[in-house]
Amino acid sequence: MNTESAASTADRLRAAVHWLLPTRLLSRLTWHVARSPRPWLKNRLNRFLVRRYGLDLSEAEHSDPTAYPTFYALFTRALRPGARPLPEDPQALISPCDGTVSAVGHLHGERLIQAKGIEYSLRGLLHGLDPAPFRDGAFVTIYLSPRDYHRFHAPVAGRLQAERHVPGRLLTVAPSAVRAIRGLFLRNERHVTLWETVVGLVAVVPVGAVNVGSIETVWGGPVGEAPGLSRDFGPGEGVFLGRGEELGRFNLGSTVVVVLPAGVVRWADGLVAGRPVRMGEVLGRLRRADAR
């Protein structure tokens, strides 16, 4: 099991301050400002974003930050075609997003590791969906900072079997908060998706954060517009996504958790907490569920 280091006193102090912030109000204000098309506002914000966080737009659809119609459009920018060629190995599990690995390893029964010394419940994360297929399975958690590309993609080809929108807090998911706030991913808004794949069910769970009040999926749009959304799909009914196809997007920094069944993935050498990853990068190698 590989996780970030334990919480420091500074981490706990930052978390305590963050608890006092009106995060949902801040997210609503950010939502309106980020979608303003006024050139004087959005161009200043977009240039500030590039300077403040060092955004690399060389792979983006537009390399000029003022070419984006809104601040939100820059944050949720698309990559230009061909910017991220996928690995030729059909058994490669790819990173669903750009970001930094905050935890990777295997479940202890139905328990995942959030950070050093902090576990949380898979049953709680899935919010009513059956955790049994993932018992003693594998997981990886990837944090997206404000500078990262903010769309997330299918780590393996699959058909959507179920989805659940879970309303919740919008606490920061920055590394300091992950180390300090127990059950952080269970407290925050998230959208649980289960995918039927060649290795069995795979869960992909985008987790919201402060300023990230609107998780979107490519098949349903902003999921926050249907709080408590709960849908199950019969054979052949759910959307099918090929490996690397866009699954959704969200604004500002957030987190994606991927959970797999036991025995179906061998993590790549060097995949450890703190390592930067890019969408399309190989995280591990899969083997079919029936080959175990």
UniProtKB/Swiss-Prot annotation:
Domain of life, source organism: Bacteria
Post-translational modification: Is synthesized initially as an inactive proenzyme. Formation of the active enzyme involves a self-maturation process in which the active site pyruvoyl group is generated from an internal serine residue via an autocatalytic post-translational modification. Two non-identical subunits are generated from the proenzyme in this reaction, and the pyruvate is formed at the N-terminus of the alpha chain, which is derived from the carboxyl end of the proenzyme.
Modified residues (Pyruvic acid (Ser)): S254
Single Gene Ontology MF annotation: phosphatidylserine decarboxylase activity
Keyword line: Cell membrane, Decarboxylase, Lipid biosynthesis, Lipid metabolism, Lyase, Membrane, Phospholipid biosynthesis, Phospholipid metabolism, Pyruvate, Zymogen
GO BP terms, alphabetized: phosphatidylethanolamine biosynthetic process
Subcellular location: Cell membrane
Annotated pathway: Phospholipid metabolism; phosphatidylethanolamine biosynthesis; phosphatidylethanolamine from CDP-diacylglycerol: step 2/2
Annotated active site: D98, H153, S254
InterPro entries (alphabetical): PS_Dcarbxylase, PSD-B, PSD_type1_pro
Top-level EC class as recorded in UniProt: lyase
Topology in membrane: Peripheral membrane protein
PANTHER family in UniProt: PHOSPHATIDYLSERINE DECARBOXYLASE (PTHR10067), PHOSPHATIDYLSERINE DECARBOXYLASE PROENZYME, MITOCHONDRIAL (PTHR10067:SF6)
Family: Belongs to the phosphatidylserine decarboxylase family. PSD-B subfamily. Prokaryotic type I sub-subfamily.
Protein's recorded name: Phosphatidylserine decarboxylase proenzyme
UniProt lineage: Bacteria, Pseudomonadati, Pseudomonadota, Gammaproteobacteria, Chromatiales
